[in-house]
Amino acid sequence: RDSTWTTWYKNGNKKFLATYINGKLNGKYIRWYEGGIIKELDGDYLNNKKHNKWVSWAKNGQKTEEINYDNGVHHGSHINWYGDKNDQHKSFHVNYKNGAKDGDWHYWYASGVDSLKSNYLDGEKDGHWVWWRKNGLKDKEGFYKKEKKHGVWTIWNDSSGIAYHKLHEET
């Protein structure tokens, strides 16, 4: 198969479009909801593997997810959203490098309040990490170095707001 294939719903609206070269998915791939106007999924393939940015939408047209690939491997940002069109905010925004967790990772509660900010380096916990409670108050904070807790960690008491500290030394 060497061509762009399009399929249709019974109502005449486009269902999906896919490009093939030498029998493999290569190029644009788009899938629509039955109404035919709102996309469900849009991305590219390279030799049957997801490539570049892939975007997903909900039936109401709201963008729900963006994922970046390099020849089938997570590479770059991956973002997911909560909510409806009137109150849309991120669920998470994370990063990959050649399939490994890398860089800033940020999660939010459904309310939009921060849940976790963290850092990775080549797939390992490395750098500053902060957790929050659903009410927006910090829960704990510290550093990782090559997957291990490092330095002073601060943990806050639920009710009094009083913090205590714990030192993690290199082993």
Task: Please give the residue ranges for each predicted region.
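Glycine/tyrosine- and acidic-biased, solvent-exposed loop/turn segments at the edges of beta-strands
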Residues: 1-171
